[in-house]
From Swiss-Prot:
Pfam families linked: M20_dimer, Peptidase_M20
GO cellular component, one term: cytosol
Residues the record lists as binding Zn(2+) 2: D143, E178, H382
Protein EC: 3.4.11.4
Keyword tRNA-binding belongs to the record: no
GO biological process: peptide catabolic process; proteolysis
Entry protein name: Peptidase T
Organism: Enterococcus faecalis (strain ATCC 700802 / V583)
Key words of the record: Aminopeptidase, Cytoplasm, Hydrolase, Metal-binding, Metalloprotease, Protease, Zinc
Family membership noted in the UniProt record: Belongs to the peptidase M20B family.
This protein's encoding gene: pepT
Cofactor binding annotation: Binds 2 Zn(2+) ions per subunit.
Length: 409
């Protein structure tokens, strides 16, 4: 249906654009800067207007002007350029046409890694479809290059089909979503839309307007290391204090034991020696009150464990990352209803459920543009088992076009 969609997607995923959490630049990697320039050129060649690369925040933005005389709300469509922290060098996508919904798909030549319905029962949903997989050595990058390809293809289609009426549409492709800072510098005034959607969801039908509230705790523990043979009543083992800290948290409130709207504490890093140790926690909850209570629990444990000492052995740097965008979006649910209607008119069953994570839309919503999240089609993201269906990407492209059309009525 969209002859350029698959070639466009394959071209994008072969471009390495991982973000780097240790970087102090925006974008965090030069590969993203180069990719942004490539996308800027492509947008210009499509015939989009006001194409800009913002060097301050790393976003490429462009405008498709309205082709209706009446005033209608302006819409934004957003996707991110970076991929997750997994090998993304020399991505070599494989194409499996007319998948039968049952067979095992070998990824690497040795057959060490496979996509099979035992481990990935979601494969059964793709009978008769064209799957794009990895070769087992890298991720694919459908998160979120499928979103970029879908937005780009939808804009191309609308430009080539002026009979489809729409208001002003703006698109934005940004950096560093995977490391949680992509939208920190997003320029709401420059983007200038009434509402937007991130095309960054998973399987067909996903429509999300509720995310976690998110915080991070960086913990530094100062021990006192002496020879173990003479350590009694003298040694303060920073590693043991770290273990004590972790054990003071609720044992069942961790990612591997929670689902749905249950929040958690996640020990993301723990390193050190008896002399000094560091820990990183991410704290997540959909409920704002429980979220605040979780942060308070971290501080309470710090105070309890510091109490026996004559100095502060445990220091906590606790900071918020993003908030549940539902608090913003529920003030005007019409933007969710438009997306829902678009899917239903395309015979797509909307799957409306909270995101157990965040999106760029989480921050952009609080910056002033309500921004729900729509499926982009990918499955098993962030690793070698990632795949996407061509038909899923076509459906996402259809949804973008249908939203634009419905908004203009």
């Amino acid at each position: 249906m969209y002859e350029n969609l698959l070639p466009r997607f394959l071209r994008y995923v072969k471009t390495e654009t991982r973000s780097d959490a240790t970087s102090t630049t925006t974008p965090s990697t030069q590969t993203q800067v180069a990719f942004a320039q490539t996308l800027k050129k492509e947008l210009e060649e499509l015939g989009m207007s006001d194409v800009i690369y913002n060097e301050t925040n790393g976003f490429v933005i462009a405008t498709l002007p309205s082709n209706v005389e009446k005033d209608v709300r302006s819409i934004g469509f957003i996707a991110h350029m970076d991929t997750a922290d997994f090998n993304a060098v020399n991505v070599s996508p494989q194409i499996v046409e007319n998948y039968d919904g049952e067979s095992t798909i070998p990824l690497d030549k040795e057959g060490k890694f496979t996509l099979n319905t035992k481990d990935f029962p979601n494969l059964k949903n793709y009978r008769g479809e064209t799957l794009i997989t990895t070769d087992g050595t890298t991720l694919l990058g459908a998160d979120d290059k499928s979103g970029i390809a879908e937005i780009m293809t939808a804009m191309e289609y609308l430009i080539n089909h002026p009979e489809i009426k729409h208001g002003t549409i703006r698109v934005a492709f940004g950096p560093d979503e995977e490391i949680g800072v992509g939208a920190d510098k997003f320029d709401v005034a420059q983007f200038n839309v009434d509402f937007a959607y991130t095309m960054d969801g998973g399987p067909v039908g996903e429509l999300q307007f509720e995310t976690f509230n998110a915080a991070q705790a960086e913990i530094t523990i100062q021990g006192k290391n002496v020879h173990p043979g003479t350590a009694k009543n003298t040694m303060i083992n920073a590693l043991q204090l770290g273990i004590d800290f972790h054990n003071a948290l609720p044992a069942d409130e961790v990612p591997e034991k929670t689902a749905g709207e249950e929040g958690f504490y996640h020990l993301a890093a723990f390193a050190g020696t008896p002399e000094e140790a560091t820990m990183t926690y991410i704290i997540r909850d959909h409920n704002r009150e429980i979220f605040e209570a979780r942060k308070a629990k971290i501080k309470e444990i710090q105070q309890t464990l510091n109490a026996p000492f004559d100095e502060e052995r445990i220091k906590v740097d606790l900071f918020d990352q993003y908030y549940n965008m539902r608090e913003v979006i529920e003030k005007d649910m019409s933007i969710v209803e438009i997306a829902k209607q678009a899917m239903e008119e395309l015979s797509i069953q909307p799957i409306i459920e909270p995101v157990r994570g965040g999106t760029d839309g989480s921050k952009i919503s609080y910056l002033g543009i309500p921004t729900p999240n729509i499926f982009a089609g990918g499955e098993n993201m962030h690793g070698r088992f990632e795949f996407v269906s061509l038909q899923a990407m076509e459906k996402a492209t259809n949804v973008i076009i249908k939203i634009a059309e419905l908004n203009a009525k």
